[in-house]
């Protein structure tokens, strides 16, 4: 099983938090190969795109890359800022189960899948369908949707997205997302994709649309082992909510999931990189 990751300027130039995360993946998974790609690798792998891939922000290019890699090779995708707390073999089979696919997810009522950590067996039907959908979406370069500009999006959609960004998480977010689902998915709809703008979470929305329209894709996701994506953000959430006192919450936060998503721009204290006892970590 290959473990894929990406840092645009190369692993050797990555910031300290990224270096620590990547090294931890190697240390914990000696039976598996960690492949860290850079901008040149990406350009080669995505050379069949119908436009210069470098016209897109690096985050969008990385979104395309991860699905392409998993379609071609199978394996696991891990964001470079994803801190592992357990060896992959401890939970990979549990997570992929009979579907051969796993992504952390939001509430099943709207099936918003995260893409910061993905596992897919070679030839997995969901990944194949998603890669096909991505190719169909990126027929031309688009500009990242910026709330400060007036895009070709209908004004109502602009207000909807702004409201979403102020809702936060929890029940308010869930109610809002359920009510405005069609509007949020507008950019990847047949009409919305004719424009020249795309939202930051375009790939997550495209996965949701795929689940809505492709019975086979939906069956895979509904049979997938369910783990809520919020469990992977407990360390970051603690830092945002508790400020300097968050360090006291770190031991508990680290036990919530086999992986924790970090922000590479933050100077994380050493407590964040301390390993809890394996048996205490939720799988």
For the regions a protein language model found, what residue spans apply to each?
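Glycosyltransferase-associated regions of secretory-pathway enzymes
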Residues: 1-63, 78-283
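Small-residue hinge/turn detector
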Residues: 63-75
């Amino acid at each position: 099983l290959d473990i894929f990751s990406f840092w645009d300027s190369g692993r050797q130039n990555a910031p300290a938090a990224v270096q620590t995360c990547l090294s931890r993946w190697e240390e914990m998974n000696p039976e598996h190969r960690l492949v860290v790609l850079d901008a040149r690798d990406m350009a080669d792998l995505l050379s069949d795109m119908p436009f210069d891939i470098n016209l897109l922000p690096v985050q969008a290019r990385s979104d395309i890359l991860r699905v392409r890699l998993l379609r071609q090779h199978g394996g696991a995708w891990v964001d470079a800022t994803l801190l592992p707390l357990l060896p992959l073999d401890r939970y990979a089979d549990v997570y992929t189960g009979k579907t051969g696919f796993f992504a952390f997810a939001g509430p099943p009522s709207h099936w918003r899948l995260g893409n910061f950590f993905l596992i897919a067996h070679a030839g997995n039907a969901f990944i194949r369908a998603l890669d096909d959908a991505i190719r169909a979406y990126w027929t031309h370069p688009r500009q990242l949707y910026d709330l400060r500009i007036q895009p070709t999006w209908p004004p109502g959609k602009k207000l909807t997205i702004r409201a979403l960004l102020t809702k936060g998480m929890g029940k308010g977010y869930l109610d809002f997302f359920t009510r405005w689902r069609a509007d949020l998915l507008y950019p990847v709809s047949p009409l919305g994709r004719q424009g020249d703008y795309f939202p930051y979470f375009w790939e997550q929305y495209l996965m949701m649309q795929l689940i809505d329209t492709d019975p086979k894709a939906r069956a895979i996701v509904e049979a997938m082992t369910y783990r809520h994506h919020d469990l992977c953000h407990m360390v970051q959430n603690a830092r945002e909510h508790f400020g300097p006192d968050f360090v006291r919450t770190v031991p508990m936060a680290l036990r919530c999931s086999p992986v924790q998503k970090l922000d590479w721009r933050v100077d994380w204290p050493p407590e964040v990189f301390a390993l809890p006892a394996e048996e205490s970590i939720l799988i």
